[in-house]
């Protein structure tokens, strides 16, 4: 797992990728009371620009965040000045306090190729999650990820951004982002992810002690199927 460049963080924030945490946050705030659960605080792993933290804090859940990319955390601190944000590696991260709710969205777990490292993340989360607390995250669905046609858009009179997702291997995904200034390539970044077997992920959770584990293509029954699996797990009381 590698930190995003500052240029990519800026493109991410300006392009509109914040829509995903916005939709997820709205659904999460409906999902929580259906579990009879009212968390007082939350930690968002791989929080990106802090949008989910802002939504949770708007619902009086004291949400903090962490991300590997300094550029993402700089934007998160601007978006949520009252929150606490750390620049850290999710594999080894220990926040130094306990939380009722832990989230990890935007298929961040797919950025971790080794299942042994995923297991370490789950072990750490179990340790700083309060008894009875929930861990809610997502992973990409194999059937929903395929080679795509390039997509591009003008972000200013002189700048154009180009995207393409490809499957270079059976369980591999690559997202290529290019930025052109006045028609000349000025930046390129490739984001590589690994498609994980959801059953294997659920077994890892169980191995760490989590219970009430669910895996579904929709967080709410009434919402349409997503391109990700939503996985929820609870720490025993």
Regions found by a protein language model. Give the residues of each.
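SAM-dependent methyltransferase
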Residues: 136-204
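C-terminal lobe and adjacent flexible extensions of AdoMet/dcAdoMet transferase-like proteins
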Residues: 200-237
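Conserved SAM-binding loop
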Residues: 70-71, 109-115, 120
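Conserved class I S-adenosyl-L-methionine
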Residues: 1-38
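A short glycine-rich, Lys/Arg-flanked "PGG" loop and its adjoining helix->strand segment in the class I
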Residues: 119-131
């Amino acid at each position: 797992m590698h930190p995003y460049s500052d240029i990519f963080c800026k493109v991410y924030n300006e392009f509109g990728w914040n829509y995903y945490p916005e939709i997820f946050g709205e659904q999460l705030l409906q999902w929580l009371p259906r579990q009879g659960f009212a968390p007082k605080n939350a930690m968002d792993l791989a929080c990106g620009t802090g949008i989910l933290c802002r939504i949770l804090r708007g619902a009086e859940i004291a949400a903090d965040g962490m991300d590997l990319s300094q550029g993402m955390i700089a934007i998160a601190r601007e978006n949520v000045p009252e929150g606490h944000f750390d620049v850290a590696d999710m594999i080894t991260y220990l926040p130094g306090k306990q939380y009722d709710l832990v989230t990890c969205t935007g298929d961040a777990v797919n950025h971790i190729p080794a299942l042994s490292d995923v297991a370490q993340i789950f072990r750490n989360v179990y340790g700083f999650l309060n008894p009875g607390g929930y861990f809610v995250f997502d992973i990409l669905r194999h059937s929903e990820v395929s080679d795509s046609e390039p997509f591009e858009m003008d972000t200013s009179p002189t700048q154009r951004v180009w995207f393409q997702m490809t499957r270079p291997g059976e369980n591999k995904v690559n997202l290529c982002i290019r930025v052109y200034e006045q028609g000349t390539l000025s930046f390129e970044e490739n984001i590589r992810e690994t498609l994980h077997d959801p059953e294997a992920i659920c077994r890892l959770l169980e191995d760490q002690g989590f219970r009430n584990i669910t895996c579904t293509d929709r967080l709410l029954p009434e919402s349409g199927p997503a391109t990700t699996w939503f996985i929820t797990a609870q720490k025993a009381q």
